[in-house]
C-alpha cells in the first residue's frame, strides 16, 4: 500500500464513525485528577480502556504506581520489532481538569461526546483524550497498511496527572530510562496557532508560580479612626507589583528578563500570525515588551502576570483598613532565562526598593523551559511531512507558549522532541464547553498517518545522518 492509500484508509476509518465511538467512550470516564476521590477511575481508564486497545496493536505494558503518594498511575507500553532501525516514544495524558458540570451550556455534558455541526463537545476532547486518540488511531491505520511491520519500535507513556502538575512523571522517566529509551519523541497536546494552520512546536515555555503577601497586623481597623496612620497592605502590594512590571506589561526586574531574541528565532517567528479568529480576543498592540511582534512576545519572551489579587472583602467591603493583601502571580519563561534564581531576583528587588514587608511564598517552577534546536534534522523532516499531507505550510514554533512536561523527555530522557497539536486556540480547553473541530480532527488524523508512514520510510536515514553530524561536531570540538 502507498502513503496516499494509507491516508485514504484513515479517512474511511473516520467517516465510518469508529473514531467517534472510541472518543465518546473515553470522554465518559470522569478522570478529574484534581479530585482526590478520582483514583479508581484514573486507574480504570488505563486498565479497562487503554490497555485492551494497545494490546490489540501488539503492545506489552507496565502499570507503574506514582512515586508521589495519592497521585495518578502511569501506563508504559511498547511494541518492539526484531529488526527495528529506530524507536519512537510518544505520550499522552488521560486525566482532565474538573468537569464544572453545571456550567456547560444547555444540552451539553462534560462526560458525553455531543456533536453539534463541526464542533464535538466533551471534557478531554481537546485536552488530551482527543489528541492521543488521534495518534493511536493513525498508528493503527499505518500498521494495517504496512501489514504489521513499521520498521521501528513504538513506546508510549500515558500519565493520569498532567492537569495536577504531572507529579511523579520525571521520577518515572528517570527510573525507567532504559525501558523508555528511544531515538525520537512525537506527541500531541495544546492548540495549533490557528484552526487552519497545522503546527509543529519543539518545546515549551516554563512556568514559575509565586505568591506575594503583606501581613500588616491582626484584624481590620476603622478607616475614619486610623486612616492615614496605618499602612494599607493593598496599596503596599500594588506598588510592589508596579515596580516589577509596568503599566504596559513590561518586566522591569532585570533578572526576570530573558536573553535577547536571536536572529534565528526572529526568522522562524516571522511568518507566525496570531489572533484574528472569530472567537479570539482582540490583541492589545501596546501590551508587553516594546519592539517585539506578537509572535515574539508569546514564543520568544517572558511574561509576568497577576492571576488574582485580594485585599479586604471584595464582596462585602467595609470602611476599614484591611490587615493583609495577597497576590497570586506567575511567569511564563523561555530557554536561557535565569529561572533557578527567579525567587532570589524578586526578593532582592523588593528589599532594594523598600518592600521588605512583602513576603514571597509558594515559589515553585512547575515546568522547565525547553526547546529543540530549530536546525535539527528532525524539525525539517517533520515540517515537510506535515506540509505534504495538509497542503499548507506548517507553522514551526520554537516552543509552545504554555507549559508542558517536555523537560521529562528532552532532558531526563535526552530525546529530540516534536509536538504536533490537534486542537485550536478557541477550543475552551480547561473551561466549560470544551470541544474539538471535526474538520481539524480529520486533518490531524491524516497528518499523523502521513508522519508515521514517513517515519517508516525515512526515519532510519535521519537517525544515521544525525549520528554522523554529531560525530563530526564532536570531532571539531576536540
Give residue spans per PLM region.
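Active-site metal-coordination/substrate-binding segment of hydrolases
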Residues: 85-155, 178, 443
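N-terminal helical capping/dimerization or prosegment-like subdomains
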Residues: 2-101, 324-326
Amino acid at each position: 500500500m502507498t502513503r496516499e492509500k494509507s491516508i485514504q484508509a484513515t479517512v474511511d476509518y473516520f467517516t465510518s464513525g469508529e473514531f467517534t465511538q472510541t472518543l465518546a467512550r473515553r470522554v465518559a470516564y470522569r478522570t478529574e485528577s484534581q479530585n482526590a476521590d478520582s483514583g479508581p477511575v484514573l486507574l480504570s481508564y488505563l486498565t479497562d480502556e487503554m490497555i485492551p486497545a494497545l494490546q490489540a496493536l501488539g503492545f506489552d505494558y507496565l502499570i507503574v504506581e506514582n512515586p508521589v503518594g495519592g497521585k495518578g498511575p502511569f501506563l508504559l507500553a511498547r511494541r518492539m520489532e526484531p529488526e527495528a532501525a529506530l524507536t519512537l516514544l510518544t505520550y499522552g495524558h488521560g486525566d482532565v481538569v474538573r468537569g464544572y458540570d453545571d456550567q456547560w451550556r444547555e444540552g451539553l455534558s462534560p462526560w458525553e461526546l455531543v456533536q453539534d455541526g463541526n464542533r464535538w463537545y466533551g471534557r478531554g476532547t481537546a485536552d488530551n483524550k482527543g489528541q492521543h486518540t488521534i495518534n493511536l488511531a493513525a498508528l493503527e491505520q499505518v500498521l494495517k497498511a504496512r501489514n504489521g511491520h513499521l520498521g521501528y519500535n513504538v513506546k508510549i507513556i500515558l500519565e493520569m496527572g498532567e492537569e495536577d502538575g504531572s507529579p511523579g512523571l520525571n521520577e518515572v522517566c528517570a527510573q525507567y530510562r532504559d525501558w523508555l529509551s528511544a531515538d525520537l519523541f512525537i506527541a500531541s497536546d495544546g492548540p495549533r496557532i490557528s484552526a487552519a494552520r497545522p503546527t509543529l512546536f519543539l518545546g515549551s515555555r516554563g512556568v514559575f508560580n509565586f505568591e506575594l503577601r503583606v501581613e500588616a497586623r491582626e484584624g481590620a481597623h476603622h478607616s475614619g479612626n486610623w486612616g492615614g496612620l496605618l499602612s494599607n497592605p493593598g496599596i503596599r502590594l500594588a506598588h510592589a507589583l508596579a515596580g516589577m512590571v509596568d503599566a504596559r506589561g513590561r518586566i522591569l526586574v532585570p533578572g526576570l528578563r530573558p536573553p535577547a531574541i536571536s536572529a534565528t528565532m526572529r526568522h522562524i517567528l516571522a511568518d507566525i500570525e496570531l489572533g484574528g479568529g472569530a472567537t479570539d480576543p482582540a490583541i492589545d498592540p501596546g501590551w508587553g515588551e516594546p519592539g517585539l511582534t506578537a509572535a515574539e512576545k508569546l514564543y520568544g519572551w517572558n511574561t509576568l502576570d497577576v492571576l488574582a489579587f485580594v485585599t479586604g472583602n471584595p464582596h462585602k467591603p467595609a470602611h476599614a483598613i484591611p490587615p493583609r493583601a495577597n497576590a497570586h502571580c506567575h511567569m511564563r519563561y523561555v530557554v536561557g532565562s535565569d529561572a533557578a534564581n527567579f525567587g532570589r531576583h524578586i526578593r532582592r528587588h523588593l528589599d532594594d526598593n523598600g518592600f521588605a514587608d512583602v513576603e514571597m511564598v509558594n515559589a515553585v517552577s512547575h515546568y522547565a523551559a525547553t526547546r529543540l534546536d530549530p536546525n535539527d534534522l528532525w524539525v525539517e523532516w517533520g515540517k515537510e511531512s506535515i506540509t505534504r499531507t495538509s497542503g499548507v505550510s506548517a507553522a514551526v514554533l520554537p516552543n509552545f507558549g504554555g507549559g508542558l512536561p517536555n523537560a521529562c523527555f528532552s532532558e531526563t530522557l535526552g530525546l529530540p522532541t516534536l509536538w504536533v497539536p490537534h486542537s485550536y486556540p478557541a477550543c475552551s480547553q480547561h473551561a466549560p464547553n470544551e470541544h474539538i473541530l471535526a474538520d481539524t480532527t480529520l486533518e490531524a488524523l491524516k497528518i499523523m498517518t502521513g508522519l508515521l508512514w514517513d517515519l517508516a520510510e525515512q526515519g532510519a536515514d535521519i537517525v544515521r545522518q544525525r549520528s554522523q553530524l554529531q560525530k563530526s561536531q564532536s570531532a571539531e570540538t576536540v
